[in-house]
Amino acid sequence: MIVDWYCLKERERGKIGGPNKIIQVDESKFGRRKYNRGRRIDGHWVLGLIENNSEDFRLIICPDNIRDAATLIPIIKKHVQEGSEIRTDAWRAYSTLNQNGYTHNVVNHSDPDNHILARDGIHTQRIEANWRPAKDWFRQRRLPGYRFPDALVEYQWRRECKKMNLDPFEQLICAIVANYKFK
């Protein structure tokens, strides 16, 4: 039901950003550490986009768990208006954003002097701060991997209800009425 609602909303809402608008973009892996050790994580890569001064936080699963430029740039183009300023980390897949109609600014998290702010003061802290609540929500539910896409939509729906101070039950009823015809 919520997935149907999300698909309807996805068609209705336009792209984020535009001239003089800043979009923070980052990718993160959702999953569990293999054997509870080290950095190896089995799971799903998700691309997150958020516009400064907006609550429109978009999460898109990277197809086939691939996060190269050939995969990420079309996703960004689908969700972000050209002319936007995009701020990312130094992941090489973002290196062609300038050639795709965007102003691209980079924060190098491996810079030993300052891994949070770039030298010119730009940062990606807003998108980074949104990963923790999302991952905590998934961690609490311990869902099997095949349920991840639907659960990601449910998380976004619940987040939107909370941010807009809406009753989730009432919104569920509205989604049912909007998506199904009753005789």
Residue ranges of model-derived segments:
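Residue-level recognition of single "structural anchor" positions
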Residues: 1-183
